[in-house]
Amino acid sequence: MLVVDRELQEFLSAYSVNHSNSFLGKRDEQKLKVRERLMKEGLALFSSTGFEKTTVAHIVEKSEIARGTFYNYFPDTQKLFDALIEELNQNIKAAIQQTRRDSKNVYDYLYGTFKNYFELIGTPQMIQFHILNQAHIRQSSYQSNVIKTIVKNLNRDLKSDFKIKAFTEKYEFLLLSFMLVGSPPELFLATHTTNINFSNDQLATFLAKLFHKVLME
């Protein structure tokens, strides 16, 4: 009887642990889905009406969740906006790293990096998002840890991997890194707020030629 009781206890204990883990897994999955829905609806609203005209009330209405639930994920709309920028920057960082591995020369690296960037932000929704929220995107991006890492990696590459003769001072490489990061979004905004249409390939080719000439010639 003692053996049976012990076996039953062990079975119930194991069941309790497994059931608890399953519950936690489902709960975490549900939390992730809610967060993704908030970010999706937040992006849609920021893209259609702009950050300044978007409120928590608007987001929770579109997301079909309680207002209190929103604050379990973000303290305000600014933090949700920052999370969107951080996610975009993570995708940009991953694309740069992949391009770095695949490129056989400096020009290919520059072109591939710029082309991937323009394709990531070149959808109709992302174009509108950038046009309506220029100042907020700049502020959020340059405070982003991901952007700081991208600048740091570029600075390292420029100083060590590329045979650049025109620049020798450390501060010059840092400024070059900032220009490589800052130029694409400014060119993107300038061209998408005019009536002149440029393809992603044209924009990427122009920047690649420009920076290749500056860096290598």
Listing of model-derived features with the role each one plays in the protein:
Residues 1-33:
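N-terminal intrinsically disordered/low-complexity leader segments
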Residues 37, 45-79, 83:
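Helix-turn-helix
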Residues 38-46, 92, 117:
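Short hydrophobic clusters on alpha-helical segments that form packing/core surfaces
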Residues 74, 81-91, 95, 129-131:
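Alpha-helical DNA-contacting segments of helix-turn-helix folds
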Residues 83, 97-123, 176, 180, ...:
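Hydrophobic alpha-helical connector segments
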Residues 90-93, 139-164, 174-178, 205:
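Amphipathic alpha-helical packing segments from all-alpha helical-bundle domains
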Residues 116-141, 187-193:
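Amphipathic alpha-helical segments used for helix-helix packing
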Residues 129-132, 162-209:
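Hydrophobic/aromatic-rich alpha-helical bundle segments in the mid-to-C-terminal region
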